[in-house]
């Protein structure tokens, strides 16, 4: 077993994320289109006119069952993209945006959220997934209050988004969304980015188009919910949430973050709009987190990761140990977690 310290930093030059392609997931099926792309439309007068109940429809909602999906839809879409272009993607590391977000924010995680990752090398790339079994350990079924918190986040997306730009939407489409029950369909953007010397391909769910006039990932928006801020504790909770929101938006190149604030009984009280690049300023005075420090930590961690042997189908596990400020690396026995369709495609190239 080897390890490296989480106190290590490596100054990083950055390249702007560039969208390579996108895809939709509908009822679990991947299609190389924008059928699940949504558009933001929630005028202030709509919020002021009458309280929007973010628990409406919860009695008819079934929380999506989590299961171990590895990198399956990302690799399925990548194999489709490469078949169309006839060339292999230029990247050293391939993973989900959410995984890099967890690594990036680890130095400032006050909750000591466990991070256990599996890594394999194949055909010129390191692939990173979160270990499913480790992620499930200690998880408890949400109580009624937590279920309302979870649902209100999904519901905010339903009431704030349209299937088409507002000027193409009918009055019925605009008004009926308040009765919609959220489902698990997704729109995913796949971008190529570079942090330091690390060339990365990441996929991440995108909530909506916020600025239709912008191009690429600059047009996208990320929707978040949080309780109203009434005291210092509420403010600190929001600052920490903003850290995660900033990191995940920064990695994908999303320029806009929209916060919906809920009351104690889960009514939508107000909406705030932020530019992703401005969020680190909100942590400046209290020093709850530093965007620059997180980028440098991510760069150091990914650079260490690339020291692993470039031998096809070998498996390793990375365990982030907050208490001892280190990351342990062990070699694993077992089969690759890569999608067979993708592996077969690469072998046929």
UniProtKB/Swiss-Prot annotation:
InterPro entries given in the database record: RAI1, RAI1-like_fam
Function: Decapping enzyme for NAD-capped RNAs: specifically hydrolyzes the nicotinamide adenine dinucleotide (NAD) cap from a subset of RNAs by removing the entire NAD moiety from the 5'-end of an NAD-capped RNA. The NAD-cap is present at the 5'-end of some RNAs and snoRNAs. In contrast to the canonical 5'-end N7 methylguanosine (m7G) cap, the NAD cap promotes mRNA decay. Also acts as a non-canonical decapping enzyme that removes the entire cap structure of m7G capped or incompletely capped RNAs.
BP GO annotations: cleavage in ITS2 between 5.8S rRNA and LSU-rRNA of tricistronic rRNA transcript (SSU-rRNA, 5.8S rRNA, LSU-rRNA); deadenylation-independent decapping of nuclear-transcribed mRNA; mRNA processing; NAD-cap decapping; nuclear polyadenylation-dependent rRNA catabolic process; nuclear-transcribed mRNA catabolic process; positive regulation of termination of RNA polymerase II transcription; termination of RNA polymerase II transcription, poly(A)-coupled
Top-level taxon of the source organism: Eukaryota
Annotated positions binding substrate: 205, 224, 248
Family: Belongs to the DXO/Dom3Z family.
Cofactor annotation comment: Divalent metal cation.
Reactions catalysed according to its record: a 5'-end NAD(+)-phospho-ribonucleoside in mRNA + H2O = a 5'-end phospho-ribonucleoside in mRNA + NAD(+) + H(+); a 5'-end (N(7)-methyl 5'-triphosphoguanosine)-ribonucleoside-ribonucleotide in mRNA + H2O = a (N(7)-methyl 5'-triphosphoguanosine)-nucleoside + a 5'-end phospho-ribonucleoside in mRNA + H(+); a 5'-end triphospho-ribonucleoside in mRNA + H2O = a 5'-end phospho-ribonucleoside in mRNA + diphosphate + H(+)
Location of this chain's protein in the cell: Nucleus
Keyword Membrane set for record: no
Subunit structure: Interacts with RAT1; the interaction is direct, stabilizes RAT1 protein structure and stimulates its exoribonuclease activity. The interaction also stimulates RAI1 pyrophosphohydrolase activity, probably by recruiting it to mRNA substrates.
Cofactor dependency: a divalent metal cation
Binding site for a divalent metal cation: 157, 207, 222-223
Location, primary (coarse class): nucleus
Keywords assigned: Hydrolase, Metal-binding, mRNA processing, Nuclease, Nucleotide-binding, Nucleus, RNA-binding
Protein name in UniProt: Decapping nuclease RAI1
Any single Gene Ontology cellular-component annotation: RNA polymerase II termination complex
An example Gene Ontology molecular-function term: phosphodiesterase decapping endonuclease activity
Catalytic activity, EC: 3.6.1.-
Disulfide bonds: none
């Amino acid at each position: 077993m080897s390890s490296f310290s989480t106190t290590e930093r490596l100054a990083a030059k950055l390249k702007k994320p560039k969208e390579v392609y996108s895809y939709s997931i509908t009822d679990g099926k991947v299609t190389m289109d924008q059928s699940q792309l949504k558009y933001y439309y929630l005028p202030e007068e709509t919020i002021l006119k009458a309280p929007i109940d973010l628990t409406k429809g919860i009695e008819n909602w079934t929380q999506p069952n989590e299961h171990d999906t590895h990198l399956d839809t990302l690799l399925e879409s990548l194999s489709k993209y490469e078949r169309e272009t006839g060339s292999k993607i230029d990247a050293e590391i391939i993973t989900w945006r959410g995984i890099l977000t967890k690594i990036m924010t680890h130095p400032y995680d006050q909750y000591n959220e466990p991070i256990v990752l599996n890594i394999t090398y194949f055909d010129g790339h390191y692939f990173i997934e979160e270990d499913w079994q480790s992620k499930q350990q200690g998880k408890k079924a949400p109580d009624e209050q937590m279920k309302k918190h979870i649902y209100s986040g999904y519901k905010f997306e339903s009431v704030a988004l349209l299937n088409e730009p507002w000027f193409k939407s009918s009055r019925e489409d605009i008004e009926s969304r308040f009765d919609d029950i959220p489902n698990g369909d997704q729109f995913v953007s796949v971008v190529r980015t570079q942090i330091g010397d690390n060339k990365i391909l990441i996929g991440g769910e995108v909530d909506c188009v916020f600025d239709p006039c912008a191009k690429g990932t600059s047009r996208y928006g990320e929707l978040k919910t949080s309780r109203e801020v009434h005291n210092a504790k509420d403010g600190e909770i929001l600052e920490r949430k903003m850290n995660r929101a900033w990191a995940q938006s920064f990695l994908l190149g999303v320029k806009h973050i929209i916060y919906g604030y809920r009351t104690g009984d889960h009514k939508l009280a107000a909406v705030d709009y932020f530019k992703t690049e401005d969020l680190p300023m909100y942590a400046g005075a209290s020093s709850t987190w530093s965007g620059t420090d997180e980028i440098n930590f991510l760069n150091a961690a990914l650079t260490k990761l690339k020291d692993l042997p470039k031998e096809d189908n070998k498996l390793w596990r990375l365990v982030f140990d907050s208490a001892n400020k280190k990351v342990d690396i062990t070699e694993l026995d077992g089969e690759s977690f890569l999608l067979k369709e993708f592996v077969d495609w690469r072998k046929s190239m």
